[in-house]
Amino acid sequence: MLQKTGRGLLAFLLIVLEWTQPSLPSPLRPICDLRVLNHFIKEAQDAEAAMKLCSEGCTLSDSVIVPQTTVEFDVWEKKSALAKAQEVQSGLWLLQEAFNFLRTSVTNTALHSHIDNSVRNLLSVNAVLRSLNIQEFTPPASAAEIEGTWRVSTATELLQVHINFLRGKVRLILLDAQACQQDVS
């Protein structure tokens, strides 16, 4: 009887230890899982590849304003969380506006699904930011009012900016988000 009780107690302790994992970091919240962002980056790369293969009906009719994608890490680290959030959200808004313009410029219907998917992914990133309690972005009256922008004149350039923005500033803001910090107890 004592042997059975000892085994049961040992099994119970193992379950409790496995459940609490006292020295292991807690798992990240699903919204912090960078595999989702990597999936969005992969889809953006697929869109860029499709755009490069396009020979007709796949051009921008005018240049569009896009966010700067370069990140000076020492400058980024010194920015407040609010400044980082505003920079990322304004960049996402600029990209959405640029993709909406691209959608009206591109006559090749095969590319419309890539463009629509890119817009959906940008909206998903915005939803993730909202779920991380990052303050909503209020777009200005004009894209020209946003600092840290430049113009691109081809669809391929737009898609490259999209990829780099996701890889850079979006990834950094997710890594910096308080809710995404691993809790090492």
From Swiss-Prot:
One of its GO terms (biological process) is pronephros development. Pfam families: EPO_TPO. Disulfide bonds join C32-C180, C54-C58. InterPro entries: 4_helix_cytokine-like_core, EPO_TPO, Erythroptn. Gene3D superfamilies: 1.20.1250.10. One of its GO terms (cellular component) is perinuclear region of cytoplasm. Expressed mainly in heart, liver and brain. Isoform 2 is brain specific. Keywords: Disulfide bond, Erythrocyte maturation, Hormone, Secreted, Signal. Residues 1-25 form the signal peptide. GO terms for molecular function: cytokine activity; erythropoietin receptor binding; hormone activity. The keyword Plastid does not apply. It is found in: Secreted. The keyword Disulfide bond applies. Belongs to the EPO/TPO family. Erythropoietin is the principal hormone involved in the regulation of erythrocyte differentiation and the maintenance of a physiological level of circulating erythrocyte mass. This is Erythropoietin. It comes from Takifugu rubripes (Japanese pufferfish). The gene is epo.
